Structures are given as structure tokens and as C-alpha cells.
Amino acid sequence: MTIAIRSVEKQFGRYPALNKVDLEIADGELLALLGPSGSGKTTLLRTIAGLEFPDAGQVLFDGQDVTYASAAARRVGFVFQQYALFKHMTVAKNIAFGLDVRKGKDKPSKAEIARRVEELLKLVELEGLGGRYPSQLSGGQRQRVALSRALAVQPSVLLLDEPFGALDATVRKSLRRELRRVHDATGVTTIFVTHDQEEALELADRVAILNNGRIEQIGTPDQVHDAPETAFVCGFVGEANRFDGQVSGGRFKAGALTVPASALKDGAATAYVRPHDFALDEAGFEVLIERAQVQGALTAVTALTSDGRRLEISASRADADRFTGAVKIVARKAHVYAA
């Protein structure tokens, strides 16, 4: 199922939740909607689902206008953060619910429903737990049941709203891998909302970065991290050290930092340097090391510049002993934007 969002607008009172949003989603794609609270990502997801209707613009499924069609007519599967499972029903009954409530010729036989439930239990690795109740499951298991229930009706689109937000970090990591595996096995077009950068960059084929009701950038995880198109994306995705300064003659300068900025006109600008883009170099500027902490294969370094600016630097574990006292560093790469 392909999805096209064309110039969609949505306003709540005076608040513009979506501002002329355009988005094309390919058949079978796994897309993340990433942004801070209030950016419009959940409103966009609900508009795709048919749970909200836009004030202007179009929503197309496979080229057909579904802008004002109901959620049921769109055949979407929805997974919420809080699972929304029926406590009085077994796991199997929860998964089968969407099939059980169908009417007439649309309703599968009991044998077909039972077979579908078993297929899904196997898919999400919950075989043998169909007779349990939600209260007897862990948070991660309950979220797998919610995912299975959404898939049971064979939706044209699977939508997930902060699906792992209520779970602890270890379980979230495990379920991220699980969702990717399930997506690849089913091939269903999938869109999920998250404010977790790591989650979006690890899971998605592409990531749409939202801010103030607009899409700032859409691209692969590598593209939005390594080639951010706006200052907001650069500051929001991944870690970055921010420098406010001036561009003059194709060079950006802020304190001791000087980097190329040939594409910008003279004037105020902001530069961002990723922690891993700093390197030790005697030709660079001096910083005083506050702290160097080995973290697995890397060393996390905090340093102070001569003007009191605190920098975060990421280096290899092998270089840990070199980050002590006063050292000189250079920025091998910087992203510079006009103010």
C-alpha cells in the first residue's frame, strides 16, 4: 500500500498542528515519524489512520482519496503505547478480536481464526501463551500481543504510536528488533511515531523529522544524521556541539573554532560539530580535559575551551590516555547554517 500526504493542514483552535505537510510513503516501507513533543507527529499519524480529518489537503491510499474515509474503511492496524488489551480476554481472544467481530461473509470460520491466531503467536514468538491473560504477561509480551492483534485483520497499513514508550530500555531494544523482523516477514506498509532518536535510526527505512507541524527533512537514517538539511535537524538528531558565531569570507568563526563555510554569505551563523568529528591535532585549538570516561569501545570526553565553552568529544578507547590535561583538537567536519 502506497500512501501520499498532499498539503495537509490541521489546526486545533489557534494552534497549527500540521502545516502544509507533503509526504510520499512507498509500498512495504517502514517509516518513522520523529520529533519533539508538539511537533505534529501523532496528529499526522492519526490523520493517516482516519482518527483525525484534515482541514485542508488530501490523504491517498494507492492513489485513491481516503481523506474523509473512516479508519475501518481504510483497513489500518493501530498499536498504542498502552497496549489497549482486553483484560478479561485470553491472549488468543485478544488477537482474534478483530476477526471475531466481523459480520457475514467477511467473518472467517472458527478454524480459520484459530489458524491465524496460531500463525501470529508463532510470528511474535509467543507460542503456547494463547491461554494466558494480559495480567499474566510481561510488558514486552503484552506489546507483542497488541502487535499481533493489529496484524490479525491483515491491515493494508500498520500504524504504531510510541509503541515502546512504556517499556524499560532492555525490553525496548529487544522489541525494536522484533518489530523489524515482523515487518520484513509481512511486508505491510508501516509507520510509527517516536521521540526516541535511537529507535527511529535503528528501525526505519526512512525517517521524517517533524517540527512545529512541518516536515524539516525526510531521508534514510544515515542521511538525516550525516547530512542534516536544517539547523533544527542537526541539533535534534544525534549529539552535537553548538557554536554561535559569524561567517566572513567563506569561513565560520566562534571563539577558537574556525571551519569552512563557503556556501554561506557573511553574517551570523550557527555551527554544529558531532562529538566524533573532533580529533587530536597539534595544529588545532587548545582545550582542557575535564573528564575522560571509557564506555565500551569508545571514550567519552568532556573538555573546556579557553572561553569557557564545554565540549563533548567521542574518541576511540585506544586514545583514552591521550585525553588528559591540556590538549589541542580540530573539528574535521562541521555543519554550518545561517542564523
Swiss-Prot record:
SMART domains: AAA (SM00382). It is found in: Cell inner membrane. Residues 3-237 form the ABC transporter domain. SUPFAM superfamilies: MOP-like, P-loop containing nucleoside triphosphate hydrolases. Keywords: ATP-binding, Cell inner membrane, Cell membrane, Membrane, Nucleotide-binding, Sulfate transport, Translocase, Transport. It catalyses: sulfate(out) + ATP + H2O = sulfate(in) + ADP + phosphate + H(+); thiosulfate(out) + ATP + H2O = thiosulfate(in) + ADP + phosphate + H(+). The keyword Iron does not apply. It is a peripheral membrane protein. Pfam families: ABC_tran, CysA_C_terminal. GO terms for cellular component: ATP-binding cassette (ABC) transporter complex. It is an enzyme of class 7 (translocase). It comes from the Bacteria. Its EC number is 7.3.2.3. GO terms for molecular function: ABC-type sulfate transporter activity; ABC-type thiosulfate transporter activity; ATP binding; ATP hydrolysis activity. ATP binds at G35, P36, S37, G38, S39, G40, K41, T42. PANTHER family: SPERMIDINE/PUTRESCINE IMPORT ATP-BINDING PROTEIN POTA, SPERMIDINE_PUTRESCINE IMPORT ATP-BINDING PROTEIN POTA. The complex is composed of two ATP-binding proteins (CysA), two transmembrane proteins (CysT and CysW) and a solute-binding protein (CysP). Belongs to the ABC transporter superfamily. Sulfate/tungstate importer (TC 3.A.1.6) family. NCBIfam families: 3a0106s01. Part of the ABC transporter complex CysAWTP involved in sulfate/thiosulfate import. Responsible for energy coupling to the transport system. This is Sulfate/thiosulfate import ATP-binding protein CysA. It comes from Caulobacter vibrioides (strain ATCC 19089 / CIP 103742 / CB 15).
